[in-house]
From Swiss-Prot:
Pfam families: Disulph_isomer. It comes from Symbiobacterium thermophilum (strain DSM 24528 / JCM 14929 / IAM 14863 / T). It comes from the Bacteria. One of its GO terms (biological process) is cell redox homeostasis. Gene3D superfamilies: Glutaredoxin. This is Bacilliredoxin STH2395. InterPro entries: BrxB/BrxA. Belongs to the bacilliredoxin family. Coiled coil: none annotated. NCBIfam families: YphP_YqiW.
Amino acid sequence: MDLHMFVPDFQAMREELTRLGFEELRTAEEVQEKLPTAKGVTLLAINSMCGCAGGIARPAAALALRQVKPDHLMTVFAGQDKEATAAARALFPQYPPSSPSFAVLKDGQAVAMIPRSQIEGSDPQTVAQRIVEAVQAARG
């Protein structure tokens, strides 16, 4: 029996976001160097191995980006790049850890979070609208 058929294709999950223009932050150092210093509005996707919610979040990001263009698109992968994910989450301790999720930052400060609880059980269009509204609110 080929057990590889049960292993999620993490690279494909990563590429769903990088193809959209998200920059992968794979280490804590990359996160600390880029996220806090990013000027303007940043959409941070906290990617996830979770098939159900992750399968909603990534298409939602694609739909949202048809309507809004944050200044920066960045992503970390929870469960894969653990140190990078922990470093990102340390920048917004007011929000409990959640993956998949989206954080909207303005000038390096978190101003909104779309946690897993607002992704799971929703359709990609609804989640995309939440992303659009959060980015627009950050723009002022």
